């Protein structure tokens, strides 16, 4: 296995741990704050890892390079898909068992492999297609759509997985020499704006109650931002279909 693929897989595992920590906090906050407010706060504080990396590498000069019509379109599509994913997954975390939501969320690699064919022109062999079909069979086994225990909320993590996969695939369309932290910061700003606007339209924001909630919100953003940063780095290191 190529060294870059091994490194990318390791980075993704670290990102998965960060996402799990974020998910636990989202579940804790979900009974108090509207989901869109949680998404807006998560995206605001999710800028922290990107800012730290940009400062450490002294790469802030790369940010103006994002100001291109083509990159604006990619960023808007990525950000919109992420907001939909967050709304879907965060809602699921508050409505179904954490383990079930997490397991269904792991269907992301299935969508990444499938989407890499039309969007990136990758060739996926028969073994990977077989893995995709087996993966979908596993998703259906968990959901049990024709069982009495099925809940429509179980569809939400799968929608989230598809949207996160789309965002991950689109990151390959950025120039290879563009710093990953710059890409991530641009996306975090846009997702924060979109989630905040949606929150103001559909919900009344709830005041943050106490230092403990404030601390959880900051950690949620930091974990989430770290997780997404890991995905951006991993899928730029190696072909998404190979890593997935």
Per-region residue spans from a language model:
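Membrane-interface helix-cap regions at the ends of transmembrane helices
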Residues: 47-70, 137-149, 192-213
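Transmembrane alpha-helical segments that form core, pore/gating elements
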Residues: 24-27, 31, 35-36, 50, ...
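Hydrophobic/small/kink-forming positions within alpha-helical transmembrane segments
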Residues: 16-21, 51, 79-87, 109-114, ...
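Loop-to-transmembrane-helix transition segments
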Residues: 7-15, 62-88, 152-160, 199, ...
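C-terminal transmembrane-helix exit sites in multi-pass transporters
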Residues: 89-91, 108-130
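Helix-helix packing/entry segments at the starts of transmembrane helices
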Residues: 41, 101-107, 174-190, 228-244
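Hydrophobic/aromatic residues within transmembrane alpha-helices
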Residues: 29, 38, 42, 92, ...
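Hydrophobic transmembrane alpha-helices of multi-pass small-molecule transport proteins
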Residues: 127-144, 160
């Amino acid at each position: 296995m190529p060294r870059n693929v091994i490194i990318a897989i390791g980075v993704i595992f670290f990102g998965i741990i960060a996402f799990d920590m974020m998910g636990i906090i989202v579940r804790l906050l979900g009974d108090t704050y509207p989901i869109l407010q949680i998404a807006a706060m998560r995206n605001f504080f999710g800028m922290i890892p990107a800012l730290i990396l940009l400062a450490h590498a002294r790469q802030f000069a790369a940010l103006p390079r994002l100001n291109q019509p083509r990159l604006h379109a990619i960023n808007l599509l990525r950000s919109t898909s992420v907001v939909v994913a967050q709304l879907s997954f965060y809602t699921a975390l508050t409505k179904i068992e954490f383990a079930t939501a997490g397991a269904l969320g792991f269907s992301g690699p299935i969508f990444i492999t499938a989407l890499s064919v039309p969007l990136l022109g990758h060739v996926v062999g028969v073994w990977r297609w077989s893995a995709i079909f087996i993966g979908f069979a596993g998703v259906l086994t968990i959901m049990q759509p024709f069982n009495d225990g099925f809940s429509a909320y179980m569809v939400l993590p799968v929608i989230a997985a598809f949207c996160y996969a789309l965002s991950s695939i689109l990151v390959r369309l950025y120039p290879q020499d563009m710093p990953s932290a710059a890409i991530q910061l641009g996306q975090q700003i846009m997702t924060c704006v979109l989630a905040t606007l949606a929150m103001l339209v559909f919900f009344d924001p709830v005041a943050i109650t106490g230092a403990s909630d404030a601390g959880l919100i900051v950690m949620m953003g930091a974990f989430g931002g770290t997780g997404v940063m890991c995905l951006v780095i991993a899928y730029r290191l190696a072909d998404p279909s190979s890593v997935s």
